[in-house]
Amino acid sequence: MTNPDLENAKYINLATYRKNGDVVKTPVWVAVHNGTGYIFSEPNVGKVKRIRNNPKVQIAECDMRGGLLGEWANGTARLVNDQAEIDAMYPAFNRKYGVIMHITNFLAKLVGRYQRRQIIAVTLD
């Protein structure tokens, strides 16, 4: 199993596990800061609940619809609540996704979702 190129992958497919073991795959943006991949999400969605119950994940490079472009790699996810870590990782998203990230952040702030975001850190095994 090869590790996906998180620095250059526009999207990754994040596979999380339900309590019954079923896999749920979700295409997401990812940015790397200090060797850790970061994802942001709404706080009460399924992937966050599944990570809270089981931090084991798999990731693979994919297109925006989740079509695989690379091989799966095993990893561990954790929910980030440390504000200093959150503040430190956001510039990586801004560099990687540029204007689209700035627009996404502006709209999220406009509707009150920016501060509610749940940040997820993924490290490869």
Show the residue positions of the predicted features:
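A generic local structural motif
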Residues: 1, 24-26, 44-46, 106-108
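Short, structured beta-strand-loop surface elements
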Residues: 46-119, 125
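Protein maturation boundaries and topogenic segments
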Residues: 1-10
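Short beta-strand segments
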Residues: 9-43, 58-61, 71-73
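Short, structured patches in soluble enzyme cores that scaffold and shape functional sites
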Residues: 16, 123-124
